[in-house]
């Protein structure tokens, strides 16, 4: 996925779970453009994970085993809402 193609990133944020949509959509709308290219790549990697994993990480039921992705989870949770 292209880092600068915001439409594709927004589309990838559309998940099968409303709880994830509520986190990802505001993050993309309000924060994604200001991320470094490295963090954009990391966010896209996060979007490639399965919904049940993402749900568990974002709801705090499990800790993401990948430290880089875990950092992005914290960043999204902390900055998704305006």
Swiss-Prot record:
| Localization terms from the record | Cytoplasm
* S-S bonds: none
Q: What is its main location?
A: cytoplasm
Any transmembrane segments, and where?
Answer: none
Regarding protein family, the annotation reads: Belongs to the SdhE FAD assembly factor family.
Q: What does this protein do?
A: An FAD assembly protein, which accelerates covalent attachment of the cofactor into other proteins. Plays an essential role in the assembly of succinate dehydrogenase (SDH, respiratory complex II), an enzyme complex that is a component of both the tricarboxylic acid cycle and the electron transport chain, and which couples the oxidation of succinate to fumarate with the reduction of ubiquinone (coenzyme Q) to ubiquinol. Required for flavinylation (covalent attachment of FAD) of the flavoprotein subunit SdhA of SDH and other flavinylated proteins as well.
Question: What is the recorded name of this protein?
Answer: FAD assembly factor SdhE
């Amino acid at each position: 996925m292209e880092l600068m193609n915001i439409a594709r990133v927004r589309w990838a944020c559309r998940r099968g779970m409303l709880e994830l949509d509520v986190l990802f959509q505001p993050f993309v709308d309000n924060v994604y453009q200001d991320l470094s290219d490295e963090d954009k790549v990391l966010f896209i990697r996060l979007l490639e994970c399965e919904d049940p994993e993402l749900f568990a990480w974002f709801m705090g039921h499990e800790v993401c085993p990948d430290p880089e992705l875990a950092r992005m989870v914290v960043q999204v949770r902390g900055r998704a809402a305006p």
